[in-house]
UniProtKB/Swiss-Prot annotation:
It comes from Staphylococcus saprophyticus subsp. saprophyticus (strain ATCC 15305 / DSM 20229 / NCIMB 8711 / NCTC 7292 / S-41). One of its GO terms (cellular component) is cytoplasm. The lineage of its organism: Bacteria, Bacillati, Bacillota, Bacilli, Bacillales. PANTHER family: 33 KDA CHAPERONIN (PTHR30111:SF1). It is found in: Cytoplasm. This is 33 kDa chaperonin. The keyword Kinase does not apply. It comes from the Bacteria. Redox regulated molecular chaperone. Protects both thermally unfolding and oxidatively damaged proteins from irreversible aggregation. Plays an important role in the bacterial defense system toward oxidative stress. The keyword Metal-binding does not apply. Keywords: Chaperone, Cytoplasm, Disulfide bond, Redox-active center, Zinc. One of its GO terms (molecular function) is protein folding chaperone.
Length: 293
């Protein structure tokens, strides 16, 4: 069982749609699997948290993938999630770390870079995909997701993300919020929201203080204004498997498979998302080859 979960809520009589998430254990699982250093952990954790909350907007078997590519030293940050609270992610260069920035925080912007884009691909079923992209504005990721919603999905939003890392590289706290203004929202509501967000304590500090996702929303929106709709358990989950990789090997073609048999006497594949390794024997590859022929 995981302690991580996502909260879905409405506020101010439906003028505001809100999500918040506690992701400490999910991000710890990613940190353990990928051996990420603190700055990389923060970048990956923030991206996973945002992706998880975006996944909570989906239905049924729909899923989405987020790719952040700012041309920075960390390379790409990739996460995907579904409507059921499953999330996974990885970074190209997990051993990326820098001294704290001028604000005494992990320098995520320096690791991610700002010369690039945030891309979202939603798999909405029936081989139907929605793709949206926006330029990175700060590389800190919260601002970048906020800008993505405004630019690509035309929904005024505020995204706050935070990850705190312990001296031993383990994850101390991780979570975030995603608040969206619905069509027809009153100016007074929008002004209240902007004022609250501008004056709030950083997300990672609030989570570190023990605030639950519900309390995080109460802090921003006022408890009396919030209607909690649903809680969804969240966890790091990878859907890779032996058969999936065997299928991928099949796609390489006969010559490449024959090469694996002759030269390597088998094959090994590693999943980018969870680093599980899969072994394929000569016999298995030969059988695959026979089936293709």
């Amino acid at each position: 069982m995981t302690n991580d979960y996502i909260v879905k809520a409405l506020a101010f009589g439906g003028q505001i749609r809100a999500y918040s998430a506690l992701t400490t254990e999910s991000v710890q699982e990613a940190q353990t699997r990928h051996y990420t250093w603190p700055t990389a952990s923060a970048a990956l954790g923030r991206t996973m948290t945002a992706t998880l909350m975006m996944g909570a907007m989906l239905k049924g078997n729909q899923k989405l993938t987020v790719t952040v590519d700012g041309q920075g030293p960390i390379g790409k940050v990739i996460a995907d999630a579904d409507a059921k609270g499953n999330v996974r992610g990885y970074v190209t260069n997990p051993q990326t770390h820098f001294p704290l920035n001028d604000h005494g925080k992990l320098d995520v912007s320096r690791a991610v870079g700002t010369n690039g884009s945030l891309t979202v691909v939603k798999d909405v079923g029936l081989k139907d995909y929605f793709s949206g992209s926006s330029p990175l504005v700060s590389g800190e990721l919260g601002d970048d997701f906020t800008y993505y919603f405004a630019k690509s999905e035309q929904v005024p939003s505020s995204v706050g993300l935070g990850v705190l890392v312990n001296p031993d590289n383990s994850i101390k706290a991780s979570g975030g919020f995603l608040i969206q203004v619905m069509p027809g929202a009153e100016d007074e509501t929008i002004n209240k929201l902007e004022d609250a967000i501008n004056h709030m304590t950083p997300v990672s500090k609030l989570i570190d203080q023990g605030l639950t996702p519900e309390e995080l929303l109460f802090e921003i929106l006022g408890e009396e204004n919030v209607q909690i709709l649903e809680n969804v358990p969240a966890h790091f989950e990878c859907n890779c498997g032996h058969d999936k990789f065997l299928n991928a090997i099949k796609g390489l073609g006969e010559a490449e498979i024959q090469n694996m048999i002759n030269e390597d006497h088998g094959a090994e594949a590693e999943c980018h998302f969870c680093r599980n390794k899969y072994q394929f024997s000569e016999e298995e590859l030969q059988q695959l080859l026979d089936n293709i022929k």
